[in-house]
């Protein structure tokens, strides 16, 4: 098992009337609620936590991209990765990922990741995501072109990283007369690629075909199981090995000394994340054309409730989050690992409005008491029932 | 032209014929009803594929031809039609395919934008022009409401002056999965053309002087989607255009006050048809 410490960098200081008067922390939540000094302190606190994760034994530290939102304060994940690159030595620096569907200029992403690979001495992991629906509003990118922009940008970036000679790139959404990347990446042929999946069979096949890592987004275990099974099946059909370490399970985790303390403290942080951070309208998340007709039908028929209507108890039972004493968390994650067959755990420890002290304590307990129990699981030699 | 039209409808009691026209990449669905000088009706973002009271009223005096835009209603998404310029060529093809000679063109909201672009590109091809609450201009001081971001309840509130009339456009109290998918498909089709630049062609204003057709611009006085400043600007820049405002009505226009919008449209077109002294129904 590989352990990743993932950060969203939320802005937790919402106004008292947020629940009543603000439909979402994203896109239209006024930036006047961003306190400059408090925000400034947050960035440094969050970067400290990412650095501390390496110290306590995480294999990777991960950042991601969100725009115009209190849900996450990293419009440019590459800047955060740069800040971490020279302050850490061992952990993978994981950008999960650049929202190449939204970015105006994908060549810039290829350039920045290549630079990061040098700053980190070859530790960069490059995730590619489409970007959440509201970000297509935020950056005026046509969501009906999201899928093709993502595919074209991916192909362009990979070719830019692997080509030894200048080339011309012409595709429906991008045109470059000269692509000739300086610097090349340290890693050869290029950094590992991570792609999130949320049920699309095209994505499963795409990830398996390229040997990329498939990572889940926050969903119930039954749903994640379908996704991971789909990915393994796609790999089988392509006759490539579905290495468990290329299946990454994403989950918020809170560990305290006892179950009682963990739930007492953890509940509000989890509720902040799912009931405030992820408070968003259907139109915000699924702008027109962002979903294919088939995916939209699947979503409507799945009966998945909006996050805001899913109670803390349901989040726990559904496997959206894991909270408890070290023993309980280890047991629950072992159980989930048995069911899902992942070899990489992408944990969110700095959940919602959690304090720095609680985060650190949770990380320490996880590292000293949970990691050892899980470490042997989910390796290629130690395959599981789920596969 | 080619005989690609497949008539699958029946003509009883003034109900429309349903036809399909084959195009590269798919087929286009259209409704046709009434008799007289042909009127090409270009629908708004909502209401594709349906024959409303407004259509029936116009069809008492004209032959009304109401195609669904590519990707809307019963029309396939035509991969090659992905921008407003493509839509202009698409409708020039359609006019030619149907053998329409200088048809009147009536467009509402998004369809009004297409109608204006058509009249700019080929002033010689159309008869008279009626723009109902037209979209298409980029007027930063008079922003268009972002329908893409609204909840279903908010959509009703901004579209109708009297929300009680919304059932004309949104009949189902609790929409089925298929209803939601159909609405998502129409909005996706709209977004292809209208996401960016937002429901507008920044170059359209400077080209409106090319329009030669007698033009009526009619706007609902209580439009909360496209401020009436847009209609006024159209009327200002199109040579000799007439501008009218209809009270007690929101942007839903022909869904909220079908008689009023049919009347003002029919009166304007009838006057033009008479003064042009052309034999009616020339093409058929």
Features from the language model and the residues they span:
Chain A
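Conserved, mostly hydrophobic/aromatic
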Residues: 3, 53, 57, 65, ...
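An alpha-helical appendage that flanks or caps ligand/catalytic pockets
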Residues: 5-34, 147-184, 222-342, 375-387
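Internal, glycine-rich beta/alpha segment that forms the wall or movable "lid"
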Residues: 14-16, 105-210, 225-229, 233-238
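Active-site mouth loops of central-metabolism enzymes
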Residues: 29-44, 98-107, 189-198, 253-256, ...
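Acidic (Asp/Glu)-rich catalytic clusters
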Residues: 54-55, 81-89, 113, 117-124, ...
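Glycine-rich, proline-tolerant flexible connector loops at the mouths of alpha/beta enzymes
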Residues: 62-80, 100, 219, 348-358
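Alpha-helix-loop-beta-strand connector modules within alpha/beta enzyme cores
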Residues: 74-95, 366-375
């Amino acid at each position: 098992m590989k352990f990743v410490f993932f950060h969203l960098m939320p802005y937790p200081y919402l106004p008292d009337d947020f629940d009543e008067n603000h439909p979402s922390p994203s896109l239209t939540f006024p930036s006047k609620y961003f306190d400059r000094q408090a925000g400034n302190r947050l960035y440094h606190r969050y970067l400290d936590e990412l650095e501390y994760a390496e110290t306590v034994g995480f294999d990777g530290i991960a950042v991601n991209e969100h725009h115009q939102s209190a849900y996450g304060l990293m419009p440019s994940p590459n800047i955060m990765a740069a800040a971490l690159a020279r302050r850490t030595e061992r952990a993978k620096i994981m950008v999960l990922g650049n929202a190449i569907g939204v970015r105006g200029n994908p060549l810039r992403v290829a350039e920045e990741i290549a630079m990061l690979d040098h700053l980190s001495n070859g530790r960069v992991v490059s995730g590619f995501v489409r970007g959440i629906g509201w970000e297509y509003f935020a950056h005026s990118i046509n969501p009906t072109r999201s899928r093709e922009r993502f595919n074209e940008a991916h192909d362009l970036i990979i070719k830019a990283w692997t080509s030894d000679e200048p080339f011309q790139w012409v595709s429906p959404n991008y045109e470059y007369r000269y692509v000739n990347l300086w610097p090349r990446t340290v890693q050869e042929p290029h950094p590992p690629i991570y792609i999130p999946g949320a049920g699309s069979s095209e994505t499963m096949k795409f990830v398996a075909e390229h040997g990329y890592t498939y990572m889940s987004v926050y969903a119930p275990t039954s749903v994640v199981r379908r996704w991971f099974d789909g990915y393994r099946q796609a790999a089988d059909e392509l006759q490539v090995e579905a290495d468990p370490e290329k299946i990454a399970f994403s989950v918020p985790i809170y560990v305290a000394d006892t179950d009682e303390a963990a739930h007492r403290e953890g509940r509000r942080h989890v509720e902040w994340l799912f009931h405030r951070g992820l408070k968003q309208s259907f139109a915000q998340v699924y702008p027109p054309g962002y979903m294919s007709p088939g995916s939209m039908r699947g979503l409507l028929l799945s009966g998945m409730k909006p996050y805001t209507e899913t109670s803390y108890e349901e989040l726990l039972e559904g496997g959206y989050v894991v909270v408890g004493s070290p023993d309980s968390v280890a047991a629950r994650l072992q159980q989930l690992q048995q069911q899902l067959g992942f070899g990489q755990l992408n944990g969110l420890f700095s959940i919602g409005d959690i304090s720095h002290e609680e985060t650190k304590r949770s990380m320490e307990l996880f590292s000293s008491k949970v990691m050892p129990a899980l470490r042997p699981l989910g390796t290629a030699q130690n395959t599981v029932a789920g596969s | 032209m080619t005989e690609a039209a497949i008539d699958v409808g029946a003509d009883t009691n003034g109900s429309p014929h349903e036809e399909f026209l084959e195009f590269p990449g798919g087929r286009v669905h259209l409704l046709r009803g009434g008799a007289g000088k042909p009127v090409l009706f270009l629908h708004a973002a909502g209401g594709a594929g349906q024959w409303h009271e407004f259509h029936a009223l116009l069809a008492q005096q004209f032959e009304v031809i109401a195609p669904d835009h590519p990707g809307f209603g019963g029309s396939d998404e035509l991969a090659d039609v992905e921008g407003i310029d493509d839509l202009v060529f698409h409708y020039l093809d359609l006019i030619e395919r149907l053998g329409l000679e200088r048809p009147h063109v009536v467009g509402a909201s998004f369809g009004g934008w297409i109608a204006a672009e058509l009249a700019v590109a080929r002033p010689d091809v159309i008869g008279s022009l009626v723009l109902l609450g037209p979209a298409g201009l980029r007027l930063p001081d008079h922003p268009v409401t972002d329908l893409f971001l609204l909840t279903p309840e908010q959509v009703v509130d901004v579209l109708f002056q009297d929300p009680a009339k919304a059932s004309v456009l949104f009949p189902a109290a609790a929409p089925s999965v298929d209803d939601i998918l159909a609405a998502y498909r129409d909005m996706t089709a709209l977004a292809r053309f209208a996401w960016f630049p937002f429901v507008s062609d920044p170059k359209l204003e400077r080209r409106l002087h090319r329009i030669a057709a007698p033009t009526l611009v009619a706007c609902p006085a209580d439009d909360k989607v496209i401020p009436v400043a847009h209609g006024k600007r159209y009327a200002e820049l199109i040579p000799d255009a007439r501008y009218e405002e209809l009270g007690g009505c929101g942007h839903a226009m022909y869904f909220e006050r079908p008689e009023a919008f049919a009347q003002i449209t029919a009166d304007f077109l009838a006057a033009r048809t008479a003064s042009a002294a052309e034999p009616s129904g020339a093409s058929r």
